[in-house]
Regions:
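Bacterial N-terminal signal peptides that target proteins for export
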Residues: 4-25
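C-terminal motif of bacterial Sec signal peptides marking the signal peptidase cleavage site
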Residues: 34-37
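A metal-dependent hydrolase signature that marks the N-terminal structural subdomain at the beginning
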Residues: 40-152, 157-167, 316-344
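Pan-zinc metallopeptidase signature
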Residues: 75, 81, 86-89, 253-348
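Acidic helix-start/capping segments at beta-turn-to-alpha-helix junctions
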Residues: 128-144, 212-213, 228-245
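Short alpha-helix carrying the canonical HExxH Zn2+-binding catalytic motif
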Residues: 176-196
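An active-site-proximal "capping" alpha-helix that borders the catalytic cofactor pocket
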Residues: 204-223
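Active-site/pore-lining binding-face segments in mid-to-C-terminal subdomains
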Residues: 220-278
Length: 348
């Protein structure tokens, strides 16, 4: 974007909030890597990366966070024009699997989820309380439960992502970073479902695609390259699933069920997220064109990114508190030469 505005300024407002949010998720994933051992077995080529509802039982609400600065913003109406009558709160489950019990106790001790809740409360005004929980679900999953008004992140998903990314990570730190990014992407995706429901936001078209767009946009708005790497990890997580399906030998009936699902196919999600990352900064990510992003799609990606960013900011603007008031700087992609939106040849 031309001019004095900084398109990399944090969606969650002050950079201190962004750093704390990213650190929180990094610590969560680091804890998971200490307790979950996985095998390496995938042939997916990601060389370009180098540049079900369940019962909510036995849950208790935590006490208030001691982070007074963030909590102060969380408790204020701020610049939001819609009333702020609710809060994101934290609930802890009682997992049965010993390795999940250890994680759960670590989360409680370090108050990691409370920090996330307070930072979101400093950003968005909501009319009712919403719970955030990590829990044992019986399968890899993350979901918004409209009945219990809760965002649910499953320990099994963290374990699956650790296993999947171990097959492509260069070392333990790279594994940590990739799982951190993909889990953050999944959380913001479910937060998007929550906001559409709780705020009664209009969603024309497929809601699953809309919240993928929100997650990508929020991550790309982070300072520096950290958010871009997280968004790339989100894309790669779907690329890995796509690779698994391609090699699974599923029957026609099983594939038909995938086509009929409310989500886009894993491969489509992979390419969509890559497109929006490229559209955000074509010059930086020109290497993605044809490796693997098709050129015919790439020429339209800057316009796609601008539209999705503008749409989400328009929907959320009345609800953005002091912690989210700077988000309007992110509506345009970075400067780049990609021809026009009706087709053109990328400059290579």
């Amino acid at each position: 974007m031309k001019g004095s505005s900084n398109p990399r300024r944090c969606f969650f407002a002050a950079s201190s909030l962004r750093r704390k949010f990213s650190l929180t998720l990094a610590l969560i994933v680091a804890a998971s890597l200490l307790t979950i051992g996985c095998k390496r077995n995938s042939n997916l080529d990601i060389g370009f990366m180098d540049s079900s509802n369940t019962n909510n039982t036995n849950q208790t609400t935590t006490t208030q966070n001691d982070n007074t600065n963030v909590k102060g913003m969380a408790d204020k109406q701020g610049q939001a024009t819609k009333p702020d009558k609710g809060n994101f709160t934290v609930q802890y489950s009682n997992p049965r699997n010993p390795k999940y019990v250890q994680l759960n106790e670590s989360f409680k001790r370090q108050r990691l989820l409370e920090n996330i809740a307070d930072e979101i409360n400093a950003t968005i005004a909501i009319p009712e309380n919403v719970a955030i929980t990590f829990k044992e679900c019986g399968q890899p999953n993350a979901f918004w439960d409209p009945k219990t008004r809760s965002i649910n992140m499953c320990y099994e998903l963290m374990e699956q992502m650790t296993e999947d990314f171990r097959s492509v990570a260069k070392n333990e730190q790279d594994l940590n970073d990739k799982v951190n990014g993909a889990m953050t992407f999944a959380f913001i995706h479910e937060l998007g479902h929550c906001l559409i429901d709780v705020l009664h936001l209009p969603s024309t078209g497929r809601e699953e695609d809309a919240v993928d767009q929100l997650s990508t946009f929020v991550l790309l708005a982070l300072n520096g390259e950290e958010g871009e790497r997280m968004a790339l990890s989100g894309a790669i997580s779907w690329g890995i699933q796509y690779d698994k399906i391609a090699k699974s030998g599923k029957t026609a009936g099983e594939l038909n069920m995938l086509w009929a699902d409310e989500h886009s196919m894993d491969g489509q999600r992979f390419y969509n997220i890559l497109c929006w990352i490229f559209g955000h900064n074509p010059e930086k990510y020109m290497s993605l064109v044809n490796h693997p992003l098709p050129e015919a799609r790439a020429v339209r990606c800057p316009q796609e990114y601008t539209k999705l960013a503008t749409a989400w900011l328009t929907l959320l603007k009345p609800y953005l508190k002091d912690g989210g008031a700077k988000a309007s700087a992110h509506t345009q992609p970075m400067t780049g030469n990609m021809g026009n939106s009706n087709g053109g040849t990328p400059t290579k």
